[in-house]
UniProtKB/Swiss-Prot annotation:
Keywords in alphabetical order: DNA-directed RNA polymerase, Nucleotidyltransferase, Transcription, Transferase
Any one GO BP annotation for this protein: DNA-templated transcription
Protein name (Swiss-Prot/TrEMBL): DNA-directed RNA polymerase subunit omega
Molecular function, one GO term: DNA-directed RNA polymerase activity
Gene name in the database record: rpoZ
The organism of origin for this protein: Marinobacter nauticus (strain ATCC 700491 / DSM 11845 / VT8)
Keyword Nucleotide-binding: no
NCBIfam families: rpoZ
InterPro entries with a match to the protein in the record: DNA-dir_RNA_pol_omega (IPR003716), Pol_omega/Rpo6/RPB6 (IPR006110), RPB6/omega-like_sf (IPR036161)
SMART domains per record: RNA_pol_Rpb6
Length: 70
């Protein structure tokens, strides 16, 4: 996927607000907690990787229910 759009992501989440929360949490996991990306990195930043994962259905809203290990 060359470019990720909000519409691509909204097929897998309920609304834009949930999308922001989900992408933020997943990007933090990738950037600071060492989580392995579930899509090819292609030299993208963690936020773009997170959005691509959401658009491809590899990250779901269930992630929001998980407790943070801070």
């Amino acid at each position: 996927m060359a470019r990720v759009t909000v519409e691509d992501c909204l097929e897998n989440v309920d609304n834009r607000f949930q999308l922001v929360m989900l992408a933020t949490k997943r990007a933090r996991q990738i950037a600071t907690k060492g989580a392995e990306p579930m899509v090819a990195e292609e030299n993208d930043k963690p936020t773009v990787i997170a959005l691509r994962e959401i658009a491809e259905g590899k990250v779901t809203r269930d992630l929001l229910l998980e407790e943070d290990d801070d």
